[in-house]
């Protein structure tokens, strides 16, 4: 028995441990980390790991990606495989993407409200920008300290496998989708057809006042043609109308009153000509009745 029996037994035990199997590809929606995300936003686990990670379990998520991928982007070539390419060891790794772009990491996540910020489809244009290259396999015994490196390598291998099979993905989701105007702006256009037919060309609907409302409005208008803000609110609350409806009604009523006033003035002017002539004639008679005395005085004074 050698002196380093315990060390040899640990090494043999580690090498005989089966490699963690990759998760099977799910036909459902896949979520990806956007390539344009700056490095500070990509969280790396150099301290605590994924909270859902257990002993012997395999977790492929953005939180389990270490900063090793970012530091080795310039030295390790981009890796991508075809349909028949596979990973030969637990330490096999490949960095997908160019030297200036972040790797595209694939993981199976449950649907959550926060998942809406990731595009559920892969743009096929990325496949043309990343030509396939040779795999770089690194065979090394798995040690307890290299668990994070193994997770990163498996994530990169999954990304390479995902890039090698573009036919399994859903239709393209381009960036122009986010340039579409907010659909909430067209909320009025998506309403029922009855509303659109009642308001053609954006015209305001005519308010149908009841007889009680018209009576109260006419009574208030006869006492005061111009309302204050407080009085307008009181009338609107009392008649179950809006302040704008009361304001518009009084505006229209004042215009109507002016038109009626102009019409009555014209009619009065036409009748005043006769009346005025009669009055003028009466005044002339009064003047004539008073004129003889003055005329006699003038006649009496005139010979002098």
From Swiss-Prot:
GO terms for cellular component: chromatin; cytoplasm; nucleus. Residues 202-261 bind DNA. Residues 141-151 have a biased composition (Low complexity). It holds the Pfam family Homeodomain. Its main location: nucleus. GO terms for molecular function: DNA-binding transcription factor activity, RNA polymerase II-specific; sequence-specific double-stranded DNA binding. It is linked to Diencephalic-mesencephalic junction dysplasia syndrome 2: An autosomal recessive neurodevelopmental disorder with onset at birth, characterized by severe global developmental delay, hypotonia, spastic tetraparesis, generalized dystonia and severe intellectual impairment. Brain imaging shows a unique brain malformation characterized by agenesis of putamina and globi pallidi, dysgenesis of the caudate nuclei, olfactory bulbs hypoplasia, and anomaly of the diencephalic-mesencephalic junction with abnormal corticospinal tract course. This is GS homeobox 2.
